[in-house]
């Protein structure tokens, strides 16, 4: 069925594949650090706040619904603050960095949350020598984005069961009415008992809320239809069966904006884990209805983007606004035919800000003598691919590099044509269709400039090599599995420590750690010198 592929990726959590991630320190709103100021010196405080929490029109779940889900399904949401997803807490905002808030009409006018660039491109790291977390912009983050959306979607399906709906409503009333849980439970249970037969019949007739609307279309939901307060329940002024049906329609709208059908999939693919997803696989399925083989990649790096012509691991996109429009429309901004329902100015502002982020300077101690010895090693082993002009000479065939071929092979010319056609036909207020195509297929991998390479762990496009020292090790001697989720930086090995709940198995589809054997024949001392030099870039 259409779009089953994208749903399958999102609901990996349903198969118990999601693991708890090491959480950040529970601080208030992060103060602007020296490293952030170095990375984005032209940003104002408002710019920083907008990058961290500004809307991209992806708000997909009402806050009150999300809080009720968190209380109702602790198996899906092990932490109430979402820290289990690898997000950075921000108590002043109320939700972690990378989450936005906006009132959404098709969600009953309620304040809802979605994600923006910062959810995937901001991270905190520490080390044994410097335990205080350092916040970095534009880096590969630790967010388990699949588990976030998977948990929300699975919760909508689970709440189509009457008993689960009753539990959900108790928590929903408790949150929206700001009343004690026991008080809400008594009120909901009493009202439910009076209308139970009617409620169950309504849920059986339309369990997923999509009966009265065409596939892919949204219900119009007025605020009063999803309002549920303790006083009205106790007075008997509420048609609870009607409220339940409105909630099911709300869940339908949530799924529809994520291009997910009102039916769970029969099977799911493997979980990509923190800091990774199958980005173009999701977008090709959701926006083009062109499902692709599973091809996990780590989140890209948003540094010096203004100096690049083509971006992404295969150099397939040259339009900055296009890539963020695709992300917004794939992750919650509604589509009505060819019209994208989003605030273009907000997406453009996020895009413009991301263009101004510089790579972070190495924040830990450095062996300058070793770095000097490493400079010629870099020139002889790395610079021929990773240096020089930003041109297509940076593209290298999979056979030449030897790394996992899935990502390069999946982005075909047919797929590029599909995205170009989509962007030309897209309508949205303020958006002007490109005069020339900005998406292409290369079938190769791009050798990016290595500025900030110290912070790019895990390495390779699919994040299959944990540290730089291991990347300089012969592929057949690299670890076959390692853990993801740690925020502790190993200064000696140059990468995150082998900790966290998620296990990356390099034998899995798209996860190969083969290839890129450059520098593997250096002596151990030479490797250490080269690593020290790389920290200076």
Predicted features by range, described:
Residues 1-5:
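Positively charged n-region of N-terminal signal peptides that target proteins for export
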Residues 7-16:
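Bacterial N-terminal signal peptides
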Residues 17-27:
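Signal peptide processing junction and immediate N-terminal pro/mature segment
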Residues 25-537:
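Periplasmic c-type cytochrome electron-transfer domains
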